[in-house]
């Protein structure tokens, strides 16, 4: 089924509305509310939220192809404003959503389930699980099916997405901040790191990487996928597993310093090229990736 932008935007609005209600009423989600929260797909394929949408007159500044999304985008802004304590918080929520547009492409459940199933088939039963770019926790759900007693630490930088994640997994450590905020005591801590990590030439500043004697670690800060890979390797214990979906640039780049650093820290078990239309239905994007 093709990516339906209007339906995805509607799903996102209802999930955000539900999260605000749960916050306001200070309670856990019902089964029906969990289903609404789980339909949230992020805004990676919904660049319409970058357009002005505070007033009805803003419609004249929208492209004709996007006009069907104008009314729900106005509704989204109204919903966020009505549930913000002041204009500053409203702006923080909106700016955070807009910043996520470049990286918030969520993974089909069939893929996360398959990866979790393969790990289980090889008797990987992690007690401590890291998800460094969680979205609403599709990977978390998949791996917990096989390891229901595991402790999970997940990171989600976007404020509203992080709120939804927290309501979906109230008994786990869901952190609404960037992965670079993970503390040093969690180095060599996790049995498994699993994620569809963000990718692109987005820089990440990490003081530990900046001070490193390794050129590969310092240069990894220049591309977010390289940074996440090395930071994930740092967090996993000896004998642990990193299972990431990532950009083809990790293996195809002509610059080898980051790759050399990865192979210095870990052994490659498997690499699989995924079809470039795999994420079309979920995020409206085409990209060659690896896991």
Question: What are the roles of these predicted feature ranges?
Answer:
Residues 2-168, 172:
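Class I S-adenosyl-L-methionine
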Residues 112-145, 154, 177-212, 226, ...:
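Conserved proline-anchored active-site loop of SAM-dependent methyltransferases
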Residues 147, 171-172, 209-213, 259-262:
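Glycine-rich, phosphate-binding/catalytic loops in enzymes
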Residues 155-159, 220-278:
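Conserved Class I SAM-dependent methyltransferase catalytic core
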Residues 175-179, 272-273:
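Short loop/edge segments at beta-strand edges and connector loops
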Residues 184-186, 281-285:
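Short glycine-biased active-site loop of nucleotidyltransferases that positions the nucleotide triphosphate
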Residues 216-217:
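Long, Pro/Ser/Thr-rich low-complexity/intrinsically disordered regulatory tracts in eukaryotic proteins
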Residues 288-291:
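Conserved small/polar residues in nucleotide/adenosyl-binding loops
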């Amino acid at each position: 089924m093709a990516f339906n932008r209007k339906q995805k935007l509607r799903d996102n609005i209802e999930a955000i509305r539900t999260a605000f209600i749960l916050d306001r009423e200070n309670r856990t989600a019902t089964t029906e509310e969990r289903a609404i929260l789980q339909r949230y797909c992020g805004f990676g394929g919904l660049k319409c939220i970058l357009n002005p949408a505070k007033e009805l007159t803003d419609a004249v500044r929208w492209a004709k192809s996007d006009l069907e999304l104008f009314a729900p985008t106005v509704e989204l802004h109204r919903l966020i404003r009505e549930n913000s304590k002041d204009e500053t918080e409203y702006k923080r929520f909106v700016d955070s959503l807009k910043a996520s547009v470049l990286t918030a492409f969520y993974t089909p459940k069939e893929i996360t389930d398959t990866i979790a199933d393969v790990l289980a088939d090889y008797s990987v039963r992690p007690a401590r699980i890291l998800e460094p770019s969680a979205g609403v926790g599709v990977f978390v759900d998949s791996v917990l099916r096989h390891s229901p007693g595991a402790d999970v630490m997940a990171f989600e930088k976007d404020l509203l997405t992080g709120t939804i994640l927290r309501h979906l997994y109230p008994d786990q450590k869901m952190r609404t901040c960037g992965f670079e905020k993970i503390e040093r005591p969690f180095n060599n801590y996790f049995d498994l790191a699993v994620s569809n990590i963000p990718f692109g030439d987005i820089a990440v500043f990490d003081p530990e990487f900046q001070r490193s004697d390794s050129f590969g670690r310092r240069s990894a800060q220049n591309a977010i996928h390289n940074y996440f890979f090395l930071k994930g390797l740092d967090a996993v214990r000896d004998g642990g597993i990193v299972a990431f979906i990532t950009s083809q640039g990790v293996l195809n780049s002509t610059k080898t310093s980051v790759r050399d650093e990865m192979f210095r820290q870990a052994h490659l078990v498997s690499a699989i090229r995924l079809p470039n239309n795999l994420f079309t239905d979920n995020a409206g994007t085409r990209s060659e990736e690896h896991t």
